[in-house]
């Protein structure tokens, strides 16, 4: 299997950095390239903050997009245009969607905000499409080829893998960093550089962009070098693929080849279950998510500098292959684990993974997006079965037409605005960010920074005044 020939690089700028279920994309850029990184098409769109979204001064100091505070373009219009463009680009031939730290940030924002706007949230990894987080590859390169780039080194002695820092060390002009389109260009140039320097590493990385490709890579690779970095610190393991979890097709069960093979094979069924339940550093098992980018490469091709000799790791991998009954036992044990239950979310903005919209509603969504008259859209909203869909539909209509709506929709929208702007919750707090603005005015004294801080502060004060007197 070869990875897709089309690559779609995307990046966002947002109203905030924290409270990620409630911050909003206000700029999105995408670049479509071929497999040789030649640009085929691009898009760069922006919008105003939603009436119930609180912009934060720190975020605007980073991306400087204060013009969006007065934009006439709505969030719905922007998200719909992104969705339509991505579907057009990947319709005839699937694509790989590439972000930088996107699986922790941008990708989740796109998904949730497609969900808010009654659009398919999983456009980037369905219908043959794949998704990759370039940060994972950059971290692998910093470990396997530390001299390939003159990486900036942090106070802990580790390479800095922030996009702006890495491409700056390659000699690119980063004066316009944190503009979504500029960051897309940086990603293209960085991946092009990696491909020229280490084509096999990049090919394997891009193959892993889909679940099928990732499973193929795991299955054909005798010893896999796996860099696990949940936070600032990372661990590297030599692992072998055992199989897919029969009850969760997104999980690959692997075994750590560092452990004495006799000890692992002699584990009781209960011990196997216990280690699978907590596949941490002390466990001989590791669980790989097939639907997210991982830091993985062929340890027989690339030197991970494992303490255990490579010949011994290969011998261990072969011995596991000689024990198919034991492998089956491990896979059966993975099916006996209790599925983790996450606490229910009280706010519909956060419920994307709790329950998917039904087929009937999804069919109506497309009619809603295509409808031209307000009357038709209101009628379609009334036909939605899922109460969340009705609420999101009403929010969309309020963005687009605040005056000609039924009184109950206007009333519920104003109640939502008042709740977000005047009460405490999981969303950004106006008081917190007004205080932040005051502090930043003393810390960031350049005229350009002062202009940004004052613009956001004025927006917050004007809107809270309107809410309190509305």
Regions found by a protein language model. Give the residues of each.
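Conserved non-catalytic scaffold segment of RNase H-like nuclease domains
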Residues: 1-119, 160, 168-170, 267-384, ...
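Short, glycine/acidic-enriched loop or turn micro-motifs at the edges of active sites
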Residues: 14-16, 103-104, 136, 186, ...
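Active-site-proximal helix-loop-helix substrate-binding element of RNase H-like nuclease domains
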Residues: 47-70, 132-182
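Short loop/turn segments at secondary-structure transitions that flank enzyme active sites
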Residues: 51, 140, 193-197, 260-263
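Acidic, Mg2+-coordinating catalytic module of metal-dependent nucleases/exonucleases
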Residues: 96-103, 147-213
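Internal, well-ordered alpha/beta segment that forms a basic, Gly-enriched binding/recognition surface
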Residues: 103, 109-164, 168, 222-223, ...
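Acidic catalytic cores of enzymes that act on phosphate-bearing nucleotides/polynucleotides
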Residues: 207-280
């Amino acid at each position: 299997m070869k990875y897709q020939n089309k690559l779609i690089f995307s990046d966002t700028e947002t109203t905030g950095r924290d409270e990620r279920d409630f911050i909003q994309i206000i700029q999105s850029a995408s670049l479509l390239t071929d497999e040789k990184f030649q640009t085929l098409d691009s898009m760069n769109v922006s919008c105003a903050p939603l009436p119930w979204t609180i912009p934060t001064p720190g975020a605007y100091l980073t991306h400087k997009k204060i013009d969006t505070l007065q934009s006439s373009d709505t969030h719905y219009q922007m998200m719909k245009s992104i969705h339509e463009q991505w579907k057009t680009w990947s319709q005839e031939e699937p694509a790989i969607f590439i972000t930088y730290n996107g699986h922790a940030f941008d990708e989740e924002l796109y998904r949730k905000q497609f969900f808010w706007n009654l659009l398919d949230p999983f456009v980037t990894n369905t219908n043959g499409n794949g998704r990759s987080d370039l940060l994972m590859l950059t971290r692998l390169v910093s470990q396997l080829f530390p001299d390939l780039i003159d990486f900036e080194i942090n106070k802990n002695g580790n390479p800095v893998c922030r996009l702006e820092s890495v491409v700056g060390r390659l000699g690119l002009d980063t004066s316009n960093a944190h503009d979504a389109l500029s960051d897309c260009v940086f990603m293209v140039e960085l991946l092009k550089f990696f491909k020229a320097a280490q084509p096999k590493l990049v090919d394997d990385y891009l193959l892993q962009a889909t679940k099928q490709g990732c499973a193929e890579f795991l299955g054909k690779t005798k010893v896999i070098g796996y860099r696990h970095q949940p936070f600032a610190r990372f661990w590297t393991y030599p692992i072998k693929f055992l199989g897919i979890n029969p009850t969760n097709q997104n999980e690959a069960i692997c075994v750590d080849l560092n452990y004495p093979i006799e000890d692992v094979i002699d584990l009781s069924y209960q011990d196997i279950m216990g280690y699978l339940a907590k596949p941490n550093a002390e466990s001989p098992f590791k669980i790989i998510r097939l639907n997210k980018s991982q830091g993985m490469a062929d340890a027989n091709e690339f030197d991970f500098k494992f303490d255990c000799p490579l010949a011994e790791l290969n011998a261990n991998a072969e011995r596991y292959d000689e024990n198919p009954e034991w492998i089956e036992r491990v896979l059966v044990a993975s099916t006996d684990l209790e599925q983790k239950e996450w606490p229910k979310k009280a706010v519909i903005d956060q419920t994307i993974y709790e329950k998917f919209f039904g087929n009937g509603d999804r069919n109506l969504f497309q009619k809603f997006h295509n409808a031209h008259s307000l009357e038709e859209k209101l009628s379609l909203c009334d036909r939605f079965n899922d109460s969340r869909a009705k609420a999101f539909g009403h929010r969309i209509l309020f963005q687009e037409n605040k005056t000609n709506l039924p009184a109950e929709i206007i009333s519920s929208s104003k109640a939502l605005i008042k709740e977000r702007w005047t009460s405490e919750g999981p969303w950004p707090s106006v008081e917190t960010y007004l205080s932040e603005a005051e502090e930043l005015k003393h810390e960031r004294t350049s005229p350009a920074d002062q202009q940004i801080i004052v613009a956001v502060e004025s927006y917050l004060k004007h809107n809270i005044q309107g809410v309190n007197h509305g």
